[in-house]
Amino acid sequence: MEEVFRFYSNSRNIFIHKSLSLKPSTIDDPKSGYGLFVEPSKFKNDELKSETIQLLRIPKRCTFNINTLLALLGDEDEFSSKEEFQRTNDKIKIALREIMAHPNFSVFLTETNLLIIYFMIFQTIRSRYEIPENIQYYLENVLMSIEVETAMDSIENLATDYGHYPQIFGLRETLNLFKELFHDVLNLSDIKHLYSAIISRCLEIPERADTKSEEFTVHSTLVPIVDFANHEGTQKNAYFDIDPSNNDVLLLLDTKAVQSELTKPIEVFISYSPTEDLFSMLVTYGFTPDFRGNSQFWTVSFDRCFLRNYDGPDKTTNLRLFYKWMHINPVVPLVKYEHNGKTRWFLNDTTPEFDMLLLPFIPSIDDGKIARWAYDSTCHLMFTKIHCLINPEANEHALMIAENYRSLIKEKESNGDDFINLPPLAWSLRYKDTENDCVRQRHICSEDAVAVLKQEEMQDSTKTKSQFTSFFRKFLEFRRSKIIRPTSDSKVASILYQQELEIIADLAKAIDSSSTIFFSDLNVTLDTEPERLPPLRFLDDYIEISADKQEPSPICEDLSYYTPSRFTDFFQEEVSQYAAFFQDD
């Protein structure tokens, strides 16, 4: 890699400060590779008086994102002849046309994945077609030459125990897509290597639309030399930025970080992300940073089979179906935090999403006499009833419509999706109407349910959390029994298993000793905002329940005997609310 550094150092377009060099990283990890170092003794006095020192200036044209790749490919001067220019571009267009025709292409289309696809195309054609020199050099000497290991390298085994994590599920499906797209031109190891090399080196680089505009867009970008800078949150002494006048990428050193040590080389550290989400960093970069005082995060994803087999606090609520119908992300955000001299994992209950997660654990009404939630196993008739009210001409086909809804709902409840994209008419919330001193029931979305329940003056949040804690403790034991031994001997798998076992042991011990597990009980404010929760998983071609284990479906009964008032006191209001869904085209 020193040769790569020298190559770019000799470029007339790239500015590299004379103090900057490339050496094996000081990070205590045999696979940490190389890092950027500065020799403070080579700084000028006036530089040391500034707030920052410019270590690198990489012109936009020397970086690689979708826009710059298209610009390079569209420049005839990047090719030896007009014929080679046309030949290469025709080949790439044909390859892209075939790729875009794949039925799953758009499902996993992101800017980063498209960037990866371009480099995979370059890898398949580079021995027979001309490609711009900048692309060719970076592909051969950086992407295909670096040693890198991410979750992609062992994704098949990781998916066995962690397929319920959306990130792992998405990674596995992305690999399947790339295998189908490139199976006859790239071997599996090259596909995995290129993916890992690009995903672990991509930076989110802002770009100004034009010199007169104040608007910026962000692109997944590969930036030569800058991408050798390692992450170390607590030792961060540099950051990347852009020159808004021309969108050059800059690496800037915080001068204060070197003023105390001017005699020996110092490694340059940047922050890949302001939030240290350990699971995401492990999947993307293949490592997790050590805890050094700043909050770290982990989002636990519930095994879907565990949710489906757990009866809920009232022994009647199927948590898997509840969360699916209510579009509630079946994950628990955790935060690693130092409190009173001890570093521990806590459940981060300070987010709105956590309030939704607790909905099925809210205590029953009137000392358990009235269940908080009611599931309508014949909700296909509710759908049919509303459908026929919105479309009166459909009444003569009511039985057929009911059967269609029954089949549709059965399929959606059984598949691997984390959500059911239908109106939430399967579950009814019972709540206290304090104005009229009575109990009401209605179909409601999760956000509105949280708002309604917060209006109940006597809502027992302590009991709600207690019931959730009991459920979560059982889940921890379930996970401990599932991951007795890793299904892979890869570095990433080893770190992943060790980290989850640490979390399980820490939280189980806290629960068993009646210690605080909810972060809000600490009455402190997080020093860092956690990342957004991972997206809801979609896997509609996978059936979670085998046919022999499914409960027998109810026979379609006469609609005249179905009374919506069994499940809602606001039927007419709900008919109006969901009318758009039921209107026939």
Curated annotation (Swiss-Prot):
Entry superkingdom: Eukaryota
The reaction(s) this protein catalyses: L-lysyl-[cytochrome c] + S-adenosyl-L-methionine = N(6)-methyl-L-lysyl-[cytochrome c] + S-adenosyl-L-homocysteine + H(+)
Enzyme class, one word? Answer: transferase
Question: What's the chief localization of this chain?
Answer: cytoplasm
One of the protein's GO biological processes? positive regulation of transcription by RNA polymerase II
Keyword set includes S-adenosyl-L-methionine:
yes
The catalytic activity of this protein is classed by the Enzyme Commission as: 2.1.1.59
Every copy of the SET domain together lies at 18-273
Keyword Methyltransferase in record: yes
UniProt keyword annotations, A-Z: Cytoplasm, Methyltransferase, S-adenosyl-L-methionine, Transferase
Q: Where in the cell is it found?
A: Cytoplasm, Cytosol
> What Gene Ontology molecular-function terms does this entry list?
[cytochrome c]-lysine N-methyltransferase activity; histone H3K36 methyltransferase activity; histone H3K4 methyltransferase activity; transcription coactivator activity
Q: Name one GO cellular component term.
A: cytosol
Q: Where is this region: SET-like?
A: 186-288
Q: In the UniProt entry, what is the domain comment? A: The SET-like region, although related with the SET domain is not detected by any prediction method.
Q: What else is known?
A: Present with 2940 molecules/cell in log phase SD medium.
Protein family (similarity comment): Belongs to the class V-like SAM-binding methyltransferase superfamily.
Function as written in the Swiss-Prot or TrEMBL entry: Methyltransferase which mediates trimethylation of 'Lys-78' of cytochrome c (CYC1).
What is the name listed in the Swiss-Prot or TrEMBL entry for this protein? Cytochrome c lysine N-methyltransferase 1
Gene transcribed to yield this protein = CTM1
